[in-house]
Amino acid sequence: MEKVIAIGVPGLFIVGIIWLIITSNKRINNALSTASKTLGFTYIPSKNIFRKKKIFGEIDGYNCEVEVYTRSHGKSSTTYVSFFAYFPESFEMGLKINWRGEFDGDDEYLTDLFIKRNEELIETSKKNLRRLRVEDAFVNSRKVLFRKYYKADEIVKTMRDVLSLAKAIK
């Protein structure tokens, strides 16, 4: 009896983990599919549950995309959802504003002007858009895939927030 318990309990644990992974994958796929229909985007499902999932399209002249991907960190891994809004034209300043709020650019004068015009807007946006990054070509917000992003309306809302920021940046 003890041998059955010693083998059965770990076996049930492993089956439970596999079931949880498959169920979570189905839920995010359904949320992405629904969000893509709402936004009018194209959805590319992944056959493999560990591969990147992506929806993309255009809103008001801005190419947008949402990616769900897993990044390994040694023995553990984290799944992220990343929202991109690409500017119709690049600023071509070598501009980089990372998620910590650190600014960098090739042309210091132009970069300083850009920062002065947009600093308050970006700082305010960082409250809603975690890990916010702004570069010459795009605005990006990356978040850990929590339960709320299994809902299509949260994906749509965050994509629209990222797009609104991209439109407001001058």
Predicted regions and their residues:
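Charged, low-complexity intrinsically disordered regions
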Residues: A31-A35, L39-P45, F50-K52, F56-I59, ...
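Solvent-exposed, well-ordered amphipathic alpha-helical segments
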Residues: V4, E67-V68
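Transmembrane-cytosolic junction motif
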Residues: V15-L39
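Feature marks short, highly hydrophobic, charge-poor N-terminal signal-anchor/signal peptide-like helices
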Residues: M1-P10
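Generic signal for short, ordered secondary-structure residues
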Residues: I14-V15, S141
